[in-house]
Structures are given as structure tokens and as C-alpha cells.
């Protein structure tokens, strides 16, 4: 399955919530009615079955982090093999992706833009260029914008946007040097309460 490159608003409308796929402090434009399903007439959402609810939650999280289905299932399997709550492990694995850490540090205004920065070799980890968006960042790793990309306007603008919306506590960033330290893997309480990871576990456990 190819990566989705269509309207971001459509995905948020499909899930009925703001997925923060667009740049800016407020991810959606005012004209994007997330209360209505995609389409000209915005069909009303009927009552969902348990399976439908579980599927929508999985799709929502997958789209938030920009992960394809096969990758997402792989993360679930890795999470299930670790000690602790599978759902929490899953979210932590997604949070440790390099493209997500770049986004959390504010070098990219969206996860999609952050993934592009990584793919285009604009990011280094511990002084070495890494161009794999799914690379798992570990506590203590130093993530930085490479010297050749320091002057990119989009990075400067992304840092300004991040300063407005607030930066997460598990990264320590020097905005002037465009470098940061991934201090620790976030606890479940640090992450969005709008995600019900237990529904995803129930879906994959069938």
C-alpha cells in the first residue's frame, strides 16, 4: 500500500478528530469540519460495532504517526513481545521513531515534514547522518540538524511554531544550535489521552 499524499483534512474528518497533520499551532483550517465524514455531503456517522470502533482507533493512531499497515503490525508484535502493557509499549515504540523525535524537538512542523528531513539526510544522531525515519532513538541520543541544512527556512519556522505550542518534557532542545537530547522514553501519562490503545490491542488479539 502506497503512502497517502492526499488532503490531510480528509483524514482528520474520517477519524472525527484533529490528527495534527497540518502545520501550525492549530492543525486544521476553520473550513475543515471534522464533525462530518469526508465527502461533499459529509455523511453522518452511524453507530459502530465493537470491531468498527477498534479499527477506527487503529487507523487514527496509524495516521497520526504516518505509519503503513505492515509497519504498524510489526510495531504491535514488537510491543507484545516486551514486558509491560502492550498498548503502552506500542505508543512508546512509535514515539521513539526518529521522524517523531525530530517533530517533537520542533525541527519539523509536522511528522510528515520531519520524515522528509530525515529521508533527505538533514538530520544526524550522535554526530552520524541517519536517513531512516523508523530508526529507534534511545535515551541520551543527540539529534541535530546537519550543518548543510541549518539555514532552511522551514526548520526556522517549525521551531517558532513549536515554541508557540510548547515542547514536550522528554526532549531537551537548544533552538539556537538546532540540536536536542532525547532524555527519556515518555510514560503513558505523558502522551495523548485522546488515544485508547487498548482498543488496538483488542483488535490485533482476535
From Swiss-Prot:
Annotated family: Belongs to the universal ribosomal protein uS4 family.
A matching Pfam family: S4
UniProt KW RNA-binding keyword: yes
Lineage: Bacteria, Pseudomonadati, Pseudomonadota, Gammaproteobacteria, Pseudomonadales
UniProt-listed SUPFAM superfamilies: Alpha-L RNA-binding motif
Record key words, sorted: Ribonucleoprotein, Ribosomal protein, RNA-binding, rRNA-binding
Subunit structure: Part of the 30S ribosomal subunit. Contacts protein S5. The interaction surface between S4 and S5 is involved in control of translational fidelity.
Disulfide topology: none
InterPro entries attached to this UniProt entry: Ribosomal_uS4 (IPR022801), Ribosomal_uS4_bac-type (IPR005709), Ribosomal_uS4_CS (IPR018079), Ribosomal_uS4_N (IPR001912), S4_RNA-bd (IPR002942), S4_RNA-bd_sf (IPR036986)
Name by which UniProt lists this protein: Small ribosomal subunit protein uS4
Biological process, per Gene Ontology: ribosomal small subunit biogenesis; translation
Top-level taxon of the source organism: Bacteria
Domain S4 RNA-binding: 96-156
GO cellular component, one term: small ribosomal subunit
